[in-house]
C-alpha cells in the first residue's frame, strides 16, 4: 500500500511540474501587455530597435550626436519643431546646412532605405526619448504622404 501511495504522489508531482502551463501563462501575459500598450508605445518600442540598428552609430545611443558632425536628437528643437522636415530627412536623407539648438550642422545624412512603417516608428522613438515629448503619433500613412 505504501508503494502505491508513493507512486501516485510521484506521478502527481511530475505532472504538476509540467512546464507547458508555465510557458502558456507567460505567453498570455505577453499578449495582454501588447494589448494594453497604446499604438504610440508599440511604435516607440519598434522604433527603438530600428534606431539601435540604423541611427545610433552617428546620433549615438544617448541621442546626443557627435559634436560638429552629427546633430543631437536629444532635446533637439529641430526634431520637435520641424516634424515634416524631420520625417523627410529620415525618409530621403538630408544634405545641406541646418541649425539645431542654435548650432549649425552642414553634413550629409544618407537615406537609410527604411519603409514607411520603420520611418514612423523611429520618428516616434526619437520624438519621445531623451526628454523629447510628442503626443501626436507619426503614422505610416503620414510618412507615405511626405514627398521629396
Regions found by a protein language model. Give the residues of each.
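Axial heme c-ligation environment in periplasmic c-type cytochrome domains
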Residues: 68-74, 95-147
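Electrostatic cytochrome c docking/interface patches
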Residues: 23-50, 145-146
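Sequence/structural segment immediately N-terminal to covalent heme-attachment motifs in c-type
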Residues: 40-66, 78-92
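Sec-dependent signal peptide recognition
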Residues: 2-9
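C-terminal motif of bacterial Sec signal peptides marking the signal peptidase cleavage site
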Residues: 13-16
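Short, conserved catalytic or interaction motifs in soluble domains
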Residues: 19
Amino acid at each position: 500500500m505504501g508503494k502505491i501511495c508513493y507512486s501516485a504522489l510521484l506521478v502527481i508531482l511530475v505532472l504538476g511540474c509540467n512546464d507547458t502551463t508555465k510557458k502558456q501563462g507567460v505567453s498570455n501575459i505577453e499578449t495582454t501587455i501588447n494589448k494594453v500598450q497604446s499604438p504610440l508605445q508599440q511604435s516607440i518600442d519598434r522604433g527603438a530597435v530600428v534606431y539601435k540598428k540604423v541611427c545610433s552609430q552617428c546620433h549615438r545611443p544617448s541621442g546626443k550626436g557627435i559634436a560638429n558632425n552629427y546633430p543631437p536628437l536629444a532635446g533637439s528643437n529641430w526634431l520637435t519643431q520641424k516634424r515634416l522636415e524631420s520625417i523627410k530627412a529620415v525618409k530621403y536623407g538630408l544634405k545641406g546646412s541646418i541649425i539645431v539648438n542654435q548650432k549649425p550642422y552642414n553634413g550629409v545624412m544618407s537615406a537609410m532605405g527604411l519603409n514607411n512603417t520603420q520611418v514612423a516608428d523611429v520618428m516616434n522613438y526619437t520624438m519621445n526619448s531623451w526628454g523629447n515629448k510628442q503626443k501626436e503619433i507619426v503614422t505610416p500613412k503620414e510618412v507615405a504622404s511626405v514627398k521629396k
